[in-house]
Amino acid sequence: VVTPAYDELRNLRELLPRVHGVLQSLPGVDAEVLVVLPGWASHAEREEIGVLGATPILRRPTDSFGDALRSGFAAVRLASDYIITLDADGSHDPRTMSSMIAAAPLADVVVASRYVAGGSTDNSLVLRLMSKSLNAVYGRVLGISCRDISTNYKLYRREDLQRVSLRCRDFDVVEEIMFRLKQARGPGFRVVEVPDHFRERVHGVTKRRLGPFVMSYVVTLLRLRWQFRRQPPRG
């Protein structure tokens, strides 16, 4: 489990015991939890993460979200079959990991989705409309059948994920991952969505800033669309 965290210690104190509780309840699952911290994280914070049963990892070379995921992926042990990513702010329900792991043999990516039957979100109507529109545009342009491409709560095959090259620095890296995996897998790329409830964070404020957030998504969409149109047909 890879969890990027940026000043989220109060949320992690509540989240990590819940994550461990779910993982320990699943028969035959041997898991590690990596919390990817900014480079300036204090020794005391890293120690507390360890006490909470997770391994602290410092993101490199920058404190961006993209580098946080790349640093976490690189640190996952090679014996692992899967990597689950989830946010550190408590917005993702750890209990959904049970459904994700159960669906793993059927998919290249398992998505904990807000927008399938049984899924839901605490976001406002405006944010829900923006999110659904974003996901619809990305799915259509990149040829990916998925209602919730933009969520960071996903399960990937470790071998596939560590093989692709990722460039994005911001939260748009989540969509880039899906595109790169689809490129690698071709027409057989399989996505399974399981329902998840997205709740508002309890402590702190979001690190997403609307202006840069939208701009990075637009730039990434245009770049990936260009690459998608240039890639040769398979088969």
Descriptions of predicted regions:
Residues E8-Q24:
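Short, well-formed alpha-helical segments that are part of the catalytic scaffolds
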Residues R60-A75, Y82, P94-F171, R201-V218:
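Acceptor/aglycone-binding surface of glycosyltransferases and processive sugar-polymer synthases
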Residues S80-S91:
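Short beta-strand-to-loop acidic/aromatic patch adjacent to the donor-nucleotide binding site
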Residues V1-T3, L12, V19, A31-V35:
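Hydrophobic targeting segments
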Residues E8-L12, W40, F65:
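Donor nucleotide-sugar binding loop of glycosyltransferases
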Residues L37-E45, G90:
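A conserved acidic beta->alpha catalytic loop
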Residues P27-W40, R59:
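Short beta-strand/loop segment that forms part of the nucleotide-sugar
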